[in-house]
Amino acid sequence: AERRLDLKFVISYDSDIRSARKAVQEIAKKNPYVLPEREITVNVDELADSSVVLVVKFWAKKENYWQARYTMLEDIKYGFDEAGIRIPYPQMDVHLESGT
């Protein structure tokens, strides 16, 4: 039996979406738990407040679900690091007004 995985991850607005999509496609193709005969898609899922949310959808054997999930998440992080694709973290700008 097979199971589809949908993994969401974020990139910064100043990162190139095409480069991120290409990197994730290549990472998925190299992952031994991802079924190569099934379609792998990477799409923009949301334009959030401080990031672009991407989703990768791929298939794995049911018994390899967790290995596929964990290895893909780790490989995406390392792949983004190597490609210079930034994963943003929440931040807040505080503006102080002087009292008059």
What residue ranges belong to the model's regions?
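Structured, soluble regulatory/oligomerization domains located on the cytosolic or IMS-facing side
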Residues: 1-100
